[in-house]
């Protein structure tokens, strides 16, 4: 048994259940990015990047729908991991900007979600 499968077992959740939850999370986050890009860019000190945030919203919604609609969500979970890396690469340079505390909070949140995404993708692949 791997550490990841132990964590999931202790939490009382399976990898497919976690994938479904993360799929719904993608839909919610993507919807927020599509509807409230100015709020997000304002929080991060990234005004003027609303178009990019909307594009990321499309990515999140698409990935969420793919996870929820797939009989094999593992590849789509790896898509979430790639999206996490892109998000970190977009947000991290703003640590030196006007709102470093907000950016640090966003990066911590991204790291936590990325850890769940990796754990889920790995466990789904083991279960194939």
Predicted features and spans:
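Short amphipathic, positively biased membrane-proximal segments
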Residues: 1-128
């Amino acid at each position: 048994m791997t550490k990841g499968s132990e964590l999931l077992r202790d939490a009382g959740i399976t990898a497919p259940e976690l994938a479904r939850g993360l799929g719904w999370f993608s839909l919610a986050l993507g919807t927020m990015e599509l509807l409230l890009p100015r709020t997000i860019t304002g929080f991060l000190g990234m005004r003027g990047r609303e178009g990019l945030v909307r594009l990321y919203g499309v990515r999140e919604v698409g990935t969420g729908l793919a996870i929820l609609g797939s009989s094999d969500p593992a590849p789509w979970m790896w898509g979430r991991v790639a999206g996490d890396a892109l998000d970190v690469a977009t947000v991290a340079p703003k640590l030196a900007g006007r709102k470093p505390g907000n950016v640090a909070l966003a990066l911590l949140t991204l790291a936590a979600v990325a850890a769940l995404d990796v754990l889920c993708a790995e466990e789904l692949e083991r279960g194939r």
